Structures are given as C-alpha cells and as structure tokens.
From Swiss-Prot:
Pfam short name (any one): SEC-C
Origin superkingdom: Bacteria
Family assignment from sequence similarity: Belongs to the UPF0225 family.
Protein name, as recorded: UPF0225 protein Reut_A0143
Classification lineage: Bacteria, Pseudomonadati, Pseudomonadota, Betaproteobacteria, Burkholderiales
NCBIfam families linked: PRK01842.1
InterPro entries membership: NTF2-like_dom_sf (IPR032710), SEC_C_motif (IPR004027), UPF0225 (IPR023006), YchJ-like_M (IPR048469)
Amino acid sequence: MSARRPPRATPTPCPCGLGAEYDACCGRYHRGDAVPPNAEALMRSRYTAYVMGNMDWVRQTWHPSTCPADLLPDTATRWLGLSVKAHSQQDDTHAEVEFVARYKVGGRAWRLHERSRFVREPRAAGEPPVWLYVDGDMIGEAS
C-alpha cells in the first residue's frame, strides 16, 4: 500500500503581469524579503497590492509628503490587468513609469493611463534609500 501525498498547492500567478508566481515576484516585496530594485518593480508591486487589498504596502511605498490620510481599500474595484508602457530613470533618485491599468467598477470597464513619478530616498534617517511613489499625471481621459 502506498502512502498518499498531500495535494500540491497551485502556484498563484502574480497580478503584476510579469508571468511569475506571486511568492517569487511581488510577494517577496510585500513580505519584506526584498526591496524593489527600481521604480518599475515598485509600481508593479503597488498594482499587485491594490489587487490584493494590501493597503499597508501601498501606504508604506507612498512618499509621506503626498500620501492621503484616508487611504482605504476599494472593494468595489476589480482590477483586470496591467501594462507598463515606459520606465525612465532621470538620475539615481528620480524615475517615471507610464502604465495602463484596466479595471471594472459596477460592471463597467475602465482604463487608468498614468505617468507616475518616483523618488529614491531613505524612509527614516540612517536607513538605506528605497523607491517611493510621489504622484502621477493622467494621460488622456479615463475610459
């Protein structure tokens, strides 16, 4: 008689769109096992946090000078996909990421097309610098 093996857990694909498993992709940033190496990786991890309702990560990676005080999960939004259009680094501490995020609210489909600005600086004195989201400009109309 052979012993039964427990069923294998199905890997969860990462919502960020890179095609990797969540635990090996954005999950490592969310758990604190790694730090996003560039603004694009941070932006993808923030999108994934929105998909998963991880508002702690969204707040932690938002520059304190622009982070809203009333940041709450939006349970009415269903995120459908992310497409990164461009990533440009101006210098060691400034970068921009242009992306399109698709989502649905109340059965209606929308597209968020944004050019986001990021800075790389320590969160606190004596800590190593990390990428932080500052703000973004909408490109075209939301549709």
